[in-house]
Structure formats: structure tokens, C-alpha cells
């Protein structure tokens, strides 16, 4: 049994009987942190829990995906997409990498939803109050004005109540927002499957400030490939690099992120910044033998 599966089963064991019985067939060895709208409705009917109660009850399962070797502080988040599907997320840390590269649970859940094709988030449930960094990150979303935040033992509040007089994309003249469907039409002639996958990600990236359209693809020792696209933020620092989004993709797919063996990064050369150096250093900390292909378009 993997460490993740052990954590999931420990979380299951602490749930009310009716919910545990209904969840057990879902939380199997293939579970990748997504609960469909229909599954959620079925769980709610079987458990007789309210929408809020059920989301809060599921948080320990989301936190089971946490990778926290530095803090040993496990945070879970559940983002509900506009489709009604629920996406788990958890904080991620890396040994020997500066702390600015860590991923917060809210960022993880939202990135997970983005990877799965969601175009907005209606609510997010978290087991600890969102830090200022995450409040600003969420303010970039297409649905920032209507996004609701649920904490344990608290009434649901809007993001704007957590971030009064907020600064966001509209203050910089940007319409849309993070998770808006995009296709930038970047092109690259290459025989490399990893570069092609990274190009697909770059074409979905959100980079209206630096214009560094960028994406990455990671190949793991298992042979599976995971991708990530850049999620830029109006406040700059809360931006989430493409590598971090790809690591969320891998982690929520039950991969050990230390088993990345090769990667490919694609960037638009017209961008004001580059992710190349920090991507190289972070990948080398995960696996010193990793290979990295790079294309600046």
C-alpha cells in the first residue's frame, strides 16, 4: 500500500459510517482527487449531510495528498468548478528548494480544476483560513467577484470579504481572468513529444502582465506525462509557475514527484521574464539526473 493510500484510508476510517460506506468504492487505488457532481449528490443523499457538511467532511481526504517534508503541516482544499465537480488540492513543499516555490492548497485545488478544463470556481473549502498570498491568487480568477470560501466552524463568506478593497486584473485593464479558456496559437515544429505537450500547455497559459506564455511537460519514471501552464497574477508574487502546476497535476494523479526523469519547457521569447533558470534549479533538486528540453518561440 502506498503512503497516499494509507493516508486516504486513515481519513476514511474517521468518517461517519454512512459516508464511509458510500465513499469507499470511490476512494480506491485509482482515485485522483476528483468527485463528480453526480457522485457528490449521491454521497449527500446517502450520508444525509448538508452540502457544507459534506465538503468539510471530505477535507481530510484532500489533505492526504499533501507533500510537506519541511513544515509537516498538512492542508487540504476542495474547489468546486462551474460544472459542479469537486477538485481536491493540498500544499506541496520541496527539500533543498527556496520556499517561494511551495504550492498552497488553494493553488493546488484551483490548478487541478484548471487542468481538468474548468473555466471558473464557484466555491472553495479549506481546513485553515487562507493566507494573504492565496486570497490574492484567488482574486485573479474569472469568478473572483462571486467566489465563496468555506472554513470549518465558520459561516461561508465571499472572497471579497476576505480581501476587502482588493487589487486585481481589472485594475490593470485586464478582462477575463485565470481559468478563462484561452488558445494563444503558439507554434513549434518539433519531433519531441514532450515539447509538443509543453506547447499545448503554453497555449493555455494566463500571462497578461509579463506576456511570458509558457508551459511545461514532465515525464515520470512510470512513463506517464503531466503538463502545467503558467498562472500569472496581477500582484506578481502570487503567480504560479508552469512547473508548479505540472507538479500538482502529477501529485493529484498519485505520482511521486521525486520520480520525474525528463521535462520540456516552452516559452514565448517576447515575454518580459523567463522561467528557465528557476525551473532548472527546482527540477535538479527533485532529481539531479533530470533532463530538460527547452524552446523559446
UniProtKB/Swiss-Prot annotation:
UniProt binding sites for Zn(2+): 104, 131, 134
Cellular component, GO annotation: cytosol
Disulfide-bond pairs as recorded: none
Cofactor, free-text remark: Binds 1 zinc ion.
Residues in CMP/dCMP-type deaminase domain copies: 50-170, 189-297
Binding site for substrate: 91-93
InterPro entries reported in the protein's UniProt record: APOBEC/CMP_deaminase_Zn-bd, CMP_dCMP_dom, Cyd/dCyd_deaminase_Zn-bd, Cyt/Deoxycyt_deaminase, Cyt_deam_dimer, Cytidine_deaminase-like, Cytidine_deaminase_bacteria
Documented EC number(s): 3.5.4.5
UniProt keyword annotation of Metal-binding present: yes
Protein name: Cytidine deaminase
Taxonomic classification: Bacteria, Pseudomonadati, Pseudomonadota, Gammaproteobacteria, Vibrionales
Amino acid at each position: 500500500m502506498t503512503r497516499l493510500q494509507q493516508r486516504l484510508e486513515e481519513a476514511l476510517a474517521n468518517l461517519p459510517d454512512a459516508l464511509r460506506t458510500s465513499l469507499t468504492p470511490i476512494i480506491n487505488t485509482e482515485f485522483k482527487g476528483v468527485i463528480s457532481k453526480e457522485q457528490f449528490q449521491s454521497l449527500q443523499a446517502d450520508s444525509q449531510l448538508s452540502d457544507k457538511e459534506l465538503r468539510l467532511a471530505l477535507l481530510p481526504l484532500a489533505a492526504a495528498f499533501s507533500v510537506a517534508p519541511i513544515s509537516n503541516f498538512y492542508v487540504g482544499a476542495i474547489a468546486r468548478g462551474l460544472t459542479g465537480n469537486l477538485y481536491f488540492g493540498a500544499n506541496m513543499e520541496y527539500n533543498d528548494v527556496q520556499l517561494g516555490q511551495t504550492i498552497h492548497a488553494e493553488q493546488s485545488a484551483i490548478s487541478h480544476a484548471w487542468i481538468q478544463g474548468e473555466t471558473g470556481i464557484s466555491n472553495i473549502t479549506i481546513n485553515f483560513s487562507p493566507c494573504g498570498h492565496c486570497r490574492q491568487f484567488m482574486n485573479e480568477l474569472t469568478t473572483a467577484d462571486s467566489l465563496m470560501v468555506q472554513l470549518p466552524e465558520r459561516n461561508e463568506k465571499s472572497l471579497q470579504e476576505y480581501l476587502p478593497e482588493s487589487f486585481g486584473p481589472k485594475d490593470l485593464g485586464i478582462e477575463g481572468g485565470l481559468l478563462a479558456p484561452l488558445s494563444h496559437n503558439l507554434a513549434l515544429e518539433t519531433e519531441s513529444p514532450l515539447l509538443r505537450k509543453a506547447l499545448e500547455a503554453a497555449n493555455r497559459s494566463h500571462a497578461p502582465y509579463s506576456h511570458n506564455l509558457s508551459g511545461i511537460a514532465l515525464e515520470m519514471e512510470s512513463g506517464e506525462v503531466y503538463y502545467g501552464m503558467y498562472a500569472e497574477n496581477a500582484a506578481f508574487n502570487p503567480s504560479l509557475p508552469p512547473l508548479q502546476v505540472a507538479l500538482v497535476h502529477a501529485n493529484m494523479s498519485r505520482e511521486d514527484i521525486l520520480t520525474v526523469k525528463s521535462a520540456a519547457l516552452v516559452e514565448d521569447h517576447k515575454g518580459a521574464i523567463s522561467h528557465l533558470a528557476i525551473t532548472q534549479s527546482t527540477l535538479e533538486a527533485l532529481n539531479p539526473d533530470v533532463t530538460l528540453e527547452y524552446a523559446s518561440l
